[in-house]
Amino acid sequence: MKLCIALDNPSKEENLKLAKELKEYAKELWLKVGFRSYIRDGAEFIKELKLMGYNVFLDLKLYDIPNTMADAAEEIANLGVDMFNVHASAGSIALKTVMQRLEKYEKRPLVLAVTALTSFTDEEFKKIYGDSIENKAKEFAKLSHEAGLDGVVCSAFESKMIKNITDEKFITLTPGIRPFGEDAGDQARVADISLAKEQKVDFIVVGRPIYKDEDPKAKVEKILNKIKEI
């Protein structure tokens, strides 16, 4: 299981400061760049993180018509990121079109599909998608696997189930991890490290519990040690 840190600080300077503080762990860590950081800091920020030796996950959750998604995927691949995501609900044609566009790259980024945002409660999810999170997560995972994607973004509660219906090597990445039971904030379906490991999660994403900690480096060390222990 790998640790991916969400760089969601209010300034580029704060994000770079954190990345520099953790540089000795660059080979063990992934850094997630989301909407806020990418819109504000752009491609140059990605390059700076890559120069420090980090693996970068660009979290933009592409969702559009197939050709537009494929165009965006190509530009993302050109940035040199190591992983990015799309929405599974964009549909099979869109997912396949994205993967076909990336075939020309000798080393392409990993592509994951978002099943259900971890901020959703089951009740809220049903109002929009007409079914339970569990059922739709299964459906979206199968769809993504059949389209040739590398994995999905899901909560820890769906991870093992998804691997059982797709492939053990099909990647699951889980946001909203609260390593040691920290406040859930705006996340509805959170998990700690032990549950994530038990559910065979491949990547855990941790943001606020690290970058809001008084000693982020010590917190990261504690998380990495916990991952190795279990």
UniProtKB/Swiss-Prot annotation:
Keyword field contains Lyase: yes
Superkingdom assignment: Bacteria
Pfam families, per the entry: OMPdecase
UniProt-listed Gene3D superfamilies: Aldolase class I
Active-site residues per Swiss-Prot or TrEMBL entry: 61 (proton donor)
Reactions catalysed: orotidine 5'-phosphate + H(+) = UMP + CO2
Coiled coil: none
Binding site for substrate: 8, 32, 59-68, 118, 178, 187, 207-208
Listed InterPro entries: Aldolase_TIM (IPR013785), OMPdecase (IPR014732), OMPdecase_AS (IPR018089), OMPdecase_bac (IPR047596), OMPdeCOase_dom (IPR001754), RibuloseP-bd_barrel (IPR011060)
Involved pathway(s): Pyrimidine metabolism; UMP biosynthesis via de novo pathway; UMP from orotate: step 2/2
Keywords, ordered alphabetically: Decarboxylase, Lyase, Pyrimidine biosynthesis
GO biological process: 'de novo' pyrimidine nucleobase biosynthetic process; 'de novo' UMP biosynthetic process
Keyword Lyase assigned: yes
The enzyme's E.C. designation: 4.1.1.23
GO cellular component, as recorded: cytosol
GO molecular function: orotidine-5'-phosphate decarboxylase activity
Broadest EC class assigned to this enzyme: lyase
Assembly and oligomerization: Homodimer.
Functional summary from the UniProt entry: Catalyzes the decarboxylation of orotidine 5'-monophosphate (OMP) to uridine 5'-monophosphate (UMP).
Record-stated family: Belongs to the OMP decarboxylase family. Type 1 subfamily.
Name of the protein in question: Orotidine 5'-phosphate decarboxylase
Gene name in the database record: pyrF
